[in-house]
Amino acid sequence: MTKKRIAVIGGGVSGLSSIKCCLEEGLEPVCFERSADIGGLWRFQENPEEGRASIYKSVIINTSKEMMCFSDYPIPDHYPNFMHNSHVLEYFRMYAKEFGLLKYIQFKTTVCNVKKRPDFSTSGQWEVVTEHEGKTKVDVFDAVMVCTGHHTNAHLPLESFPGIEKFKGQYFHSRDYKNPEAFTGKRVVIIGIGNSGGDLAVEISHTAKQVFLSTRRGSWILNRVGKHGYPTDVLLSSRFTYFLSKILGQSLSNAYVEKQMNERFDHEMFGLKPKHRAMSQHPTVNDDLPNRIIAGMVKVKGNVKEFTETAAIFEDGSREDDIDAVIFATGYSFDFPFLEDSVKVVKNKVSLYKKVFPPNLERPTLAIIGLIQPLGAIMPISELQGRWAVQVFKGLKTLPSQSEMMAEITKAQEEIAKRYVDSQRHTIQGDYIQTMEEIAEFVGVKPNLLSLAFTDPKLALKLFFGPCTPIHYRLQGPGKWHGARKAILTTYDRIRKPLNTRETEKSNSMVSAVTTGCFMLAVVFFAIIMAYA
């Protein structure tokens, strides 16, 4: 029987994992990558080509290595918990080499058009038109996986800033920022307080004369480093914390999170406190911003009302003169011009079942992979989406009816609108654990905690109270990995490894406290398990 051929569009993180997902299910992937190398967003270039995602030289990832790794390929234990972009790219190269993925990628190949074949209603096949070195080619594929991400088109709303066309200084989108030396001794306005805006404000403040960080709403600032020095995402991303948040509800959960954030620094005193609650916006992850604010190197300002030739006038009436540069850290938009009408994007919104499948196709042979902005790591979600998609392509899993999918999409969009502030940043928002657990159930790889509580209680405790790492979804079912159990039980060893660069005397009181805590957690765990039995 001839293998099904799958077109994978994009050779970034989602594309690499999708190639591997195809191979695991005996499919034949052909990946098209418009640039000359893998890595997508995480491959730094001084002058990236148009339409390609871009990062600045100093970027450090906001999710820790245990939460962002591929599910059957842990990141080396000596790597730092929060990796520089060069380490991230190096890990992707190791992954591609380990599983032999590069031979399936056609580099310097642009996908121009993807359209249904005339017999699509019965075959589900697609015609894919590509261009390589000036030559056009048409291929037929049994399914298509779109892995182009959502950081390609810079969102630059200049129409919202009257007078910017008269401004005599330099202005550009954060996509084009590379290093701080160009701003030495200058007065710089940064518009937007997302992750890029916060990072740029901190970095440029080390060379600039003054940085003004302009924010329309304000933001809650989340530390990478949490209690006792462990990564914050490791501490927050457990089934227990997710279970607890559902019991407490949004109001109490918000109150707790805001209290924790304000214990680090008072957001109101620093001029950062927004009107919305902490869990109503994607958080800004930044360890250094409050230090630069309290040192006076970064001044927080409100929204810019207008620009003059040399000044920025803010909505509160204040004015800053002699501005040399304005950087718009205003995010990105996405589209799929090569898909024609198969997937429509309206105001940065797209209708996809579980953020993967278009509901209006006669055959479920098109999947959008990685089009999500999670409260957590995106890499493991992309991988799990790919594992689900290839099962659907093979007919091993089926999707609900079109009406059922549309009803679920409408419900999901209403929930996003209810929870989050209205922003194009939140149109593809998703919760890490909820998304992973839901798709894992579709794939057949969601851990059975009730069964494990009796057969392997040590592991069950780790699965419930420990960080919900991607490796959890290799314990059972399709794609089971024999090393999963050991990798889960040694999670904290890998977290501590890069920090153990000097011997210190261990505290007995700490060991005792940990032992007591583990015992109490075990009691709580079995009480919950028995309640659900």
From Swiss-Prot:
Q: Which residues carry this modification: Phosphothreonine?
A: 284
Q: Which tissues show it?
A: Expressed in liver.
A UniProt-annotated Pfam family: FMO-like
- Which residues are recorded as modified (Dimethylated arginine)? 5
Q: Which GO terms describe its cellular component?
A: cytosol; endoplasmic reticulum membrane
One GO molecular function term of this record is: monooxygenase activity
Keywords of the record, alphabetical order, are: Endoplasmic reticulum, FAD, Flavoprotein, Lipid metabolism, Membrane, Methylation, Microsome, Monooxygenase, NADP, Oxidoreductase, Phosphoprotein, Transmembrane, Transmembrane helix
**Xref: InterPro entries:** FAD/NAD-bd_sf (IPR036188), Flavin_mOase (IPR000960), Flavin_mOase-like (IPR020946), Flavin_mOase_5 (IPR002257), FMO-like (IPR050346)
Positions carrying Phosphotyrosine are 56
Give the principal location in a single coarse category: membrane
- Whether Oxidoreductase counts among this entry's keywords is yes
Q: Where does FAD bind?
A: 10-14, 33, 41-42, 62-63
Q: What does this protein do?
A: Acts as a Baeyer-Villiger monooxygenase on a broad range of substrates. Catalyzes the insertion of an oxygen atom into a carbon-carbon bond adjacent to a carbonyl, which converts ketones to esters. Active on diverse carbonyl compounds, whereas soft nucleophiles are mostly non- or poorly reactive. In contrast with other forms of FMO it is non- or poorly active on 'classical' substrates such as drugs, pesticides, and dietary components containing soft nucleophilic heteroatoms. Able to oxidize drug molecules bearing a carbonyl group on an aliphatic chain, such as nabumetone and pentoxifylline.
Name listed for the protein in its UniProt record: Flavin-containing monooxygenase 5
- Gene label: FMO5
